[in-house]
Amino acid sequence: MTYKKVYLKPGKEESLKRFHPCVFSGAIAKVEGEPEEGEVVDVYTSKKEFIACGHFQIGSIAVRVLTFKQEEINRDFWKRRLAVALDLRRSLNLVNNPENNTCRLVHGEGDNLPGLIIDVYGQTAVMQAHSAGMHVDRLEIAEALSEVMGDIVKHIYYKSETTLPFKADLGPENGFIKGGSPENVALENGLKFHVDWLKGQKTGFFVDQRENRHLLERYSKGRNVLNMFCYTGGFSFYAMRGGANLVHSVDSSAKAIDLTNQNVELNFPGDPRHEAFAEDAFKYLDRMGDQYDLIILDPPAFAKHRDALRNALRGYSKLNAKAFEKIKPGGILFTFSCSQVVDKKDFRNAVFTAAAQSGRSVRILHQLTQPGDHPVNIYHPEGEYLKGLVLYVE
């Protein structure tokens, strides 16, 4: 198979020699053959030496590298990559586990498949394209996925309506590529939850907090718990199973509150310990008393672009300052950032600023990140997006 060619400017191949999976538009000297959005191209150095192969896209990231070998991108290629991804999840005990039938099967660059996310919920895989190329190749990828997963996955739902660039004119759609089961209850560490892959955020659930939710369960016994930005209520029902005295879930979205209540009822029917509130987080923190001794702050990304970083850090400081002000002495604070442009150092500084302003004595108990099924490609450290701290507040 002969692909159209992209030639780099002199010296711009150095990052690719270090296996970074992105070719930025500013590194390109010329493009031969006018490739379409999402088309596979070969990348050459200024000396006309092959260096990489990937999906072409108009934008700051011009090529997302699929391989550093000169090979054909076909169904066999997708099968090989998906088989490696599945083997990793098996090693994490996330496949055929009677207590857990949900995991992230493909995590973009972390699985050497930039632009592709696949989450598995029971017998349904939710596939999401974040690049034009993965959208163009979606049907071939779905076929490969079916072959690799066998009976593990019987339904494939494609959910990319909100993740693709509008300018690409790709006709993104949401819908089943294979099957079509209405069953949307999955299992995580023995707890059940509804997955709204039709209209929910991301692929329908935040799989990346699985291990952090499990950790929270250990701290919940006898505590009054506040779960801010609760979305589907994941932290809430782990706290309930951990023996919390009461659990309050807060989210500005009434739809999220409905889903939280459904999930609590699914696991703890009629349990009076839980109450949910559809309210702005900052307003709730302003008006609440000092009844809570375990608080979870897991907000949506405050910054999706670097130009929003300064405002995002102010937002994290303000949010955590409210929690430090109100949490009971001896309380535990779980605080997170999922903003990729906010690194660990920036996030810690924002939280430390809030702690200093509060005048409270604060200790770090745990430093948290994403789980093993959200691997970070060592050559693409930008993939480490989830940061968290567990703090003891005197």
Language-model segments: residues:
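Conserved SAM-binding motif I beta-strand of class I
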Residues: 246-251
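Conserved SAM-binding loop of SAM-dependent methyltransferases across substrates and taxa
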Residues: 232-245
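C-terminal catalytic and target-recognition region of SAM-dependent MTase-like enzymes
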Residues: 332-394
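Mobile active-site "lid"/loop adjacent to the S-adenosyl-L-methionine
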Residues: 292-322
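Non-catalytic accessory regions of SAM-dependent methyltransferases
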Residues: 1-122
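S-adenosyl-L-methionine
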Residues: 255-296
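Conserved class I S-adenosyl-L-methionine
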Residues: 222-231
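Non-catalytic substrate-recognition/targeting regions of SAM-dependent transferases
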Residues: 106-119, 135-206, 214
